[in-house]
Design a protein with these regions (language model features):
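Cysteine-dependent PTP/DSP-like catalytic domain, specifically the C-terminal lobe
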Residues: 125, 129-163
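Short beta-alpha junction loops
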Residues: 38, 72, 114-117, 142-145
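Short catalytic/ligand-binding loop motif for oxyanion handling, primarily in non-cytosolic enzymes
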Residues: 41-43, 75-76, 117-122
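Catalytic cysteine-centered active loop of the rhodanese-like fold, especially the PTP/DSP P-loop
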Residues: 102-134
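Structural alpha-beta junctions
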Residues: 2, 60-63, 103, 129-137
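Hydrophobic, Leu/Ile/Phe/Ala-enriched alpha-helical segments that form helix-helix packing faces
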Residues: 16-22, 97-104, 127, 131, ...
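Helix-loop module immediately N-terminal to the HCX5R catalytic loop
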Residues: 62-110
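Glycine-rich, flexible N-terminal cofactor/catalytic loop recognition
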Residues: 1-68
Length: 163
């Protein structure tokens, strides 16, 4: 059974610390998809549940790590109060993600975004639907309830075009 675990940023970092995984010790059999916000959101959006200074990628990009920066919105682009723009996953990012997932479909996946509820869950939903013949062990503490529909649709569209 392969792991398909989705985390909040905080829980992801805790799990990586427990496993003692960093850039030097991350096993090749583990695949990480790290989703952070774009620079305009990191700099300009702050709330009780989001502080941009903590929204960073833990691992350097490498063969088994995909770092993506896009925002948790339900449309392609949103002009935000405060004069900045939030941007969802782009076609290029979705194509890259689909190819990356296809190349690593036989490994364990550890996926995170800030809350672990929307963007990362869209990836979990996509992977489970794209590879239904694989028996996935998902994170029981974080069920896939509210995946970002825009992200999910972009991944599915890319898969139809490139796989």
């Amino acid at each position: 059974m392969q792991k398909l675990y989705c985390f909040s940023r905080k829980d992801f970092n805790t799990y990586m610390d427990i496993c003692d995984w960093d850039d030097n010790t991350l096993p090749d059999s583990v695949t990480v998809i790290s989703i952070c916000c774009t620079e305009p959101v990191i700099k300009n959006y702050h709330s009780e549940h989001y502080q941009g200074k903590h929204d960073i990628h833990r691992f350097s990009s490498r063969n088994n790590v995909l770092n993506l920066d896009f925002d948790d919105i339900d449309e392609e682009v949103r002009e935000c109060s405060g004069g900045f723009t939030a941007t969802n996953i782009t076609k290029e990012q979705a194509d890259k993600a689909v190819a990356f997932i296809e190349a690593h479909k036989d490994s364990d996946f550890f996926i995170h975004c800030n809350a672990g509820k929307s963007r990362s869950q869209a990836f979990v939903k996509y992977i489970k639907e794209q590879y239904p013949y694989i028996e996935w062990d998902t994170n029981p503490k974080n069920p896939c309830l509210y995946p970002n529909v825009y992200v999910s649709n972009m991944l599915k569209r890319s898969a139809r075009e490139i796989l």
